[in-house]
Amino acid sequence: MRVAFIHPDLGIGGAERWVVDAAVGLQNLGHEVDIYTSYCNKSHCFDEVRDGLLKVTVLGDTICPHTIKGKFAIFCATFRQLHLAYELKKGPGSKVDVFVVDQLSACVPLLKLWFPKARVLFYGHFPDQLLVQNRNQMSLVKKAYRYPFDKFEEITTASADRLVVNSHFTKDMFEKTFPATKNPLVIYPCVDTDIKEQQQGLDRDMITAASQYTFLLSINRFERKKNILLAIEAFGEAQKKSSNLKLAVAGGYDFRVNENVEYLQELILACEKLKLSHISITADKYAKLLEKDTPAAVWTSIFKNDVIFFPSASNSFKNTLLHISKLLLYTPQNEHFGIVPLEGMLWKTPVLATNSGGPLETVKDNVGWTVEGKSELWAPVIDKVVHMNASDYAVLQTECVNWVNRFSQDTMASELEEAMEEVRKKAPTENVGWDYIRLGMWYSVLMTLTLSIVLLAIWP
């Protein structure tokens, strides 16, 4: 099959990790795979994209920016994806057998209209309208702005030939949010269970410098909903009993995203309030430090701090941090799935997660703990792991590896392939006639309302 993935912004994050893993997995099964995206920065993406293992084409980025004065992100993302679909109509999309759209469903009906022989599979990470923060506190104007987009999401999601989701928790959320969706298929994301090659790329100088400390690790995008503050506060409590304890905070960070920049500063202020020394290490800063000293000396100096931030950590840094850490702290509440806990288990690192959402399906009692997200409840678990005897910890590590093998890339790719083959055998989902008229009406309302708000916002 010729498969085309469509993703809004191919940066670094859980959704992007899924796209890359799914594309590589299908490619390994012999399928011809292309990824189309509205934005891809080769200095802020996964190695498979940067190194050319996957064919990535940027379309639909020439008319609309990412935001308008830092606002209207959903409007811009929707417009850019529709523009991308239009560019596919000019030629590249005509040979595609299956489109795999994820994260944003705006283009689904257009793909079905313009490419009637192809099938469209939508992979839902979570209903977008449920990701809006402080929704109940939104002003009337903002609610009016969001309403057409929410209806648009409902109609376009239901137009897909097959809806696939990342967990049973997410399945429940889609069924409650979009009653028209029928029995979404659950295909869990994966981790690459063969880490031999990744082990060769570990930073040995970092490992040596870290050997005299006990490390905790948090991996998440620098967003408020990821609740990284919980890791810092729990670490601050636990460090009172273990002075050689360190916390590494790594994750996706994009300087274009205001929240990423603001939240990192909020976390730094939290460290200062708790009297925790800290340092932020970016790729550029690390390179500059190496100009003045040896790698071993650089890491020795860095690890004198209590909390070390790694914005946009490379795979090598992230894997090394997983290798040296005693416990992974996974802080989001009601996370849709959460690939990070599985990555931790892959490196024999047990997990402490909040007792909600997808982690309840992945973090079992024999590989970690799910605890209410309060620092006073997390600190005792951290203390327990830090002082666990070697034999008990070794048993925990073995169970981690045994469990994570159920989430291999081969398993996910095979399940995705089966879903695509099944949907190709069936007639396409009916979404013509009145459905298109209804969609057009909502789209007209959406565009009119949004453009009015935009004009009011930028009018001098």
UniProtKB/Swiss-Prot annotation:
**Keyword Protein biosynthesis attributed:** no
Q: Which superkingdom heads the taxonomic lineage of this protein's source?
A: Eukaryota
For this UniProt record, the keywords arranged alphabetically read as follows: Endoplasmic reticulum, Glycoprotein, Glycosyltransferase, Membrane, Transferase, Transmembrane, Transmembrane helix
Q: Does the keyword Transferase apply?
A: yes
Q: Where in the cell is it found?
A: Endoplasmic reticulum membrane
Which InterPro entries does this one have? ALG2, Glyco_trans_1, Glyco_trans_4-like_N
Q: Would you identify the family this protein belongs to, as annotated?
A: Belongs to the glycosyltransferase group 1 family.
Per its record, how is this protein called by name? Alpha-1,3/1,6-mannosyltransferase ALG2
Gene name, per UniProt, is: ALG2
